[in-house]
Design a protein with these regions (language model features):
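Short solvent-exposed coil/turn linkers within tandem alpha-helical repeat scaffolds
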Residues: 100-107, 136-142, 161, 182-201, ...
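Terminal, low-structured helical/coil segments at or just beyond the last alpha-helical repeat
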Residues: 32, 186-188, 200, 204-216, ...
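N-terminal leader/linker segments that initiate helical-solenoid repeat arrays
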Residues: 25-109, 294-297
Length: 297
């Protein structure tokens, strides 16, 4: 899956559940001091127009190693070539490959592709499990760590088991992705502008994930700069409206009502299911700013 479609998919996946609890969150913003949990389970859009091989992480066939066997190499290449128009079929192929070749040198690439496929089909537990295995094998896979750091806190709800443990893992992945992404070497033949965009796409997800981790921990003043950075460096034509919504919410929680209204208005200007929620958020933030004392930044 391309980086832009990956980011859009994550936004679509969360937009519905964020909309569902937005009104309650505003009502409770000055009562509980804690982030409201959303409801997961909405089926995400599967991006029907993806190109074959557009998996989210290219299956790099090692060229500097002798082939283990021709059958394994052929199976890996066949998996790489599978389009994302039938994700259940692609997932089955990846799982079958790993069962047949449990020690394959292609495991990191297959794991990475499965992470994105599982997220797109809302198999989040499998995504998190296979993502952990991928990072254990390839600790410099910044893209996988970034998407996990963003998805883990967005998928949490009131019934999430061991929420603090999950938040800690997301925080670790986000910080690690932010640390190593600027140091990654440019692949041979990749144009400079594409490389910069790819790195910014990864950093956008990582800062978004870290910001939401802090938000769920009640560290709103720490969440704000992370979410601001996520919006600032987003290489897509328009930023993820979910990040603008979260930035507005974090500013409301921190009693920065003017800044909250600005973020909500930017969110409301973008098409999507969060438009009305953010429009209402901007109006509510303005009312709160007129009746309550704003905290200094």
């Amino acid at each position: 899956m391309s980086s832009s479609k990956k980011n859009a998919m994550t936004a679509i996946f969360l937009a519905g559940c964020l909309t569902a609890f937005a009104t309650t969150a505003f009502a409770q913003s000055n009562q509980t001091g804690q982030p409201t949990q959303g409801q997961s389970g909405q089926q995400p859009n599967t991006n029907k127009d993806q190109k074959p091989g557009d998996t989210g992480s290219s299956l790099e066939i090692p060229t500097n190693q002798p082939p283990v066997n021709a059958e394994e190499d052929a199976a890996a290449k066949a998996f790489q070539a599978m389009p994302n128009t039938d994700l259940p079929k692609k997932i089955t192929a990846g799982e079958d490959f790993l069962k047949k070749y449990p020690e394959s040198r292609y495991r990191p690439a297959v794991y990475s592709a499965l992470v994105f496929a599982y997220i797109q089909t809302n198999n989040l537990d499998k995504a998190f499990d296979i993502g952990d295995k991928e990072v254990a094998l390839k600790p410099d896979d910044a893209q996988t760590m970034a998407v996990l750091s963003q998805t883990i806190p967005r998928a949490m709800n009131a019934s999430t088991q061991e929420p603090q443990k999950r938040l800690a893992k997301a925080e670790t992945y986000a910080k690690r992705a932010i640390e190593i992404t600027p140091t990654l070497p440019k692949p041979e033949g990749m144009p400079d502008q594409n490389f910069v965009a790819a790195k910014n796409e990864t950093l956008t997800m990582a800062h978004s994930g870290l910001g939401l981790v802090y938000f769920r921990m009640g560290k709103y003043n720490d969440a704000i700069p992370e979410l601001e950075q996520s919006v600032k460096i987003d290489p897509n034509p328009a930023p993820d409206p979910v990040n603008l919504y979260l930035l507005g919410m974090a500013n409301v929680k921190a009693s920065h009502f003017d800044e909250a209204a600005i973020a909500f208005n930017k969110c409301a200007a973008l098409p999507g299911s969060l438009q009305n929620t953010c429009k209402n958020g901007a109006e509510e933030a303005k009312k709160q700013g007129a009746t309550q004392l704003s905290a200094p930044k």
